[in-house]
From Swiss-Prot:
Pathway: Metabolic intermediate biosynthesis; chorismate biosynthesis; chorismate from D-erythrose 4-phosphate and phosphoenolpyruvate: step 7/7
Entry keyword annotation includes NADP: yes
Cofactors (names): FMNH2
Name of the protein this chain belongs to: Chorismate synthase
InterPro entries referenced in this protein's UniProt entry, alphabetically: Chorismate_synth, Chorismate_synth_AroC_sf, Chorismate_synthase_CS
GO cellular component terms, A-Z: cytosol
Binding-site residues for FMN, renumbered to this chain: R125, S126, S127, N238, A239, G278, K293, P294, T295, S296, S297, R319
Database matches in Pfam families: Chorismate_synt (PF01264)
Domain of life: Bacteria
Enzyme Commission designation: 4.2.3.5
Lineage: Bacteria, Pseudomonadati, Pseudomonadota, Gammaproteobacteria, Enterobacterales
Protein encoded by which gene: aroC
Organism: Yersinia pseudotuberculosis serotype IB (strain PB1/+)
Length: 361
């Protein structure tokens, strides 16, 4: 089956292309009675949308969301929620030069080989434009998680190129265009972006997402473990080439005596596991990291082929992000929220009556 949906109890199906008429999604499984407005959803969409700073693509989409169904008098009805965002700033002529050429590092070649046809305008369905609907659906999940369980899902830029950012100030994340929590790194990040723009090149990034106050018990061993579903969801984001849960690949150099999260009557003493043990949430913060590749849509000439298999030189023109990782923060938050909400509903369905005498913190 086509891979346009995610989730079992909280199910999100998206549709639309980069230069199509509109983007949309259908959300099934939303409990009734949740207060939700277009303004609630718009808050996260505005964090993701293009053209909001000089560091991102200058495609200027308002990304104004419309609720088509599933909400009446300001609350969810329990029926399918339909959301739509119209595309308003397409410049398809920017892509006419690549109609018969395959951009290296993009999905052009693989989409052509899989489907026998491709929408070359901005990448069509493979464009990160599609993620606007994930953010919209994630905004609903985030509101439910916060209202019902006090769960807070937040993300930040952990690294761009050689510039690493320490988590020093959550409030600062929303006060700069990089989603950076480290004030001392704002100037180096700005310098790096100016250098990239001048060179017509791009850079990769690392994003960290943290969910706090996640209840114990979420996750369905063995194939739908919470970390497995999180990895699946986060890996589905455009340009993501790696996912880590907790300490991730750093555990390779650790010994069991230092990596285990020891438990005392006061609680866990560390969180190397990233809040997930045996595929089930432990009650600690759920922590995930994603690595995003540098976009291949750059002004630096490169080698590729055309439809006839002939060697050609390519320079990608148009409006593109020097670092796609900047706008990935709200997208990663949305995907974590979608997975957590799905698993909360699944846990309630099967194990909602389970009570344990073992302490939880």
């Amino acid at each position: 089956m086509a891979g346009n949906s995610i989730g079992q109890f909280f199910r999100v199906t998206t549709f639309g292309e980069s230069h199509g008429i509109a983007l949309g999604c259908i959300i099934d499984g939303v409990p009734p009675g949740i207060p939700i407005t277009e303004a609630d959803i718009q808050l996260d969409l505005d964090r993701r949308r293009p053209g909001t700073s000089r560091y991102t693509t200058q495609r200027r989409e308002l990304d104004q969301v419309r609720i088509l169904s599933g909400v009446f008098e300001g609350v969810t009805t329990g029926t399918s929620i339909g959301l739509m965002i119209e595309n308003t700033d397409q410049r398809s002529q920017d892509y006419s030069a690549i109609k018969d050429v395959f951009r290296p590092g993009h999905a052009d070649y693989t989409y052509e080989q899989k489907y026998g046809v491709r929408d070359y305008r901005g990448g069509g369905r493979s464009s990160a434009r599609e993620t606007a609907m994930r953010v919209a659906a994630g905004a609903i999940a985030k509101k439910y998680l916060a209202q019902k369980f006090g769960v807070q899902v937040r993300g930040y830029l952990a690294q761009m190129g050689d510039v690493s950012c320490d988590l020093l100030d959550w409030d600062l994340v929303e006060q700069n265009p990089f989603f950076c929590p480290d004030a001392s790194k704002l100037e180096p990040l700005d310098a790096l972006m100016r250098e990239l723009k001048k060179a017509g090149d791009s850079i990769g990034a690392k994003i960290t997402v943290v969910a706090e106050n996640v209840p114990v018990g979420l996750g369905e061993p063995v194939f739908d473990r919470l970390d497995a579903d999180l990895a699946h969801a986060l890996m589905s984001i455009n340009a993501v080439k790696g996912v880590e849960i907790g300490d991730g690949f750093a555990v390779v150099t650790k010994r069991g005596s230092e990596n285990r999260d020891e438990i005392t009557p006061q609680g866990f003493q560390s969180n190397h596991a990233g809040g997930i043990l045996g595929g089930i949430s432990s009650g600690q913060p759920v922590v995930a990291h994603i690595a995003l590749k540098p976009t291949s849509s750059i002004m630096v000439p490169g080698q590729t082929i055309n439809r006839q298999g002939e060697a050609v030189e390519i320079v990608t023109r148009g409006r593109h992000d020097p670092c796609v990782g900047i706008r990935a923060v709200p997208i990663a938050e949305a995907m974590m929220a979608i997975v957590l909400m799905d698993h909360l509903l699944r846990q309630r369905a099967q194990c909602g009556d389970v009570a344990s005498d073992v302490p939880r913190w």
